[in-house]
Amino acid sequence: GETNMSKRAVVIGCGHYLPKRVVENAEFEATLDTNDAWIRTRSGIERRHFAEDGETTSTLATAAAKAALDDAGLEADDIDAIILATSTADLTFPSAATMVQAQLGMTRGFAYDVQAVCAGFVFALSNANALILSGQANRVMVIGAETFSRIMDWTDRSTCVLFGDGAGAVILEARDGTGTADDRGILSVDLNSDGRHRDLLYVDGGVSTGTTGHLRMEGNQVFRHAVGKLAATATTAMTRAGVSAEDVDWIVPHQANIRII
């Protein structure tokens, strides 16, 4: 159908899943020159969850998706599309999203992955919003899921203590809105990338290298960019929605580090 600007993509259900294995900071003290106080002070992180053998990004994502379906009171085939934000898909292809589709018993619609790492969930949310506003889908499942424990360099204390495994999901549905900031749903989106900064945060493996690779990061540089860019993109999104900072009650940033937040 044609784009109706008073249509809104509204969250009607959400769910999450965390693997059962919990690793406290102290567990790293045996193998790394680090300690609980050091990790807490620099990151705010106290513990993380790691996937167990047999768990993959798609199984974590499926568990979160099922929780979101339960929350919304829907069945898998009520969903038109699944968009899964991940940088740690089970395989090179097919997409982890299609694996979730199969695990949910979903027999219709379409599914694909979005790879934008830290910003992935917001990119996927933006995709879902566009599908709904353009009339291509009525209900979209958006999932963010990672198994970063499988791309860690366990000898690098500056990175391996920061990341964990888990999944979160929301279901968006088309609803009529007024086109004003009083509406429920997604009011505005702002996306940005800058490929020139690749060397600040990347994985040194992939199809071109024949390896899975490990995460590499220039932490202090990432910190500097994150603080400035997060504030700038939030300001742009607020301007587009016609709201001021005073109107906002709750900000949910990427929770990599308490000092960035």
Where are these regions (language model features)?
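Acidic, glycine-rich active-site loops and adjacent beta-strand->loop/helix elements
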Residues: 16-17, 85-90, 116-121, 144-149, ...
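Buried hydrophobic positions in well-ordered alpha/beta secondary-structure cores of metabolic enzymes
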Residues: 11-13, 39, 68, 82, ...
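Glycine-rich phosphate-binding loops at beta-strand->alpha-helix junctions
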Residues: 85-91, 248-260
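Condensing-enzyme catalytic core mediating Claisen C-C bond formation in acyl metabolism
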Residues: 4-53, 156-228, 232-236
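Conserved catalytic cysteine-centered active-site region
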Residues: 38-59, 86-140
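Flexible, glycine-rich active-site loops centered on histidine and acidic residues
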Residues: 133-166
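Phosphate/pyrophosphate-binding loops at sites that engage ATP/ADP/AMP, CoA/4′-phosphopantetheine
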Residues: 64-80, 232-249
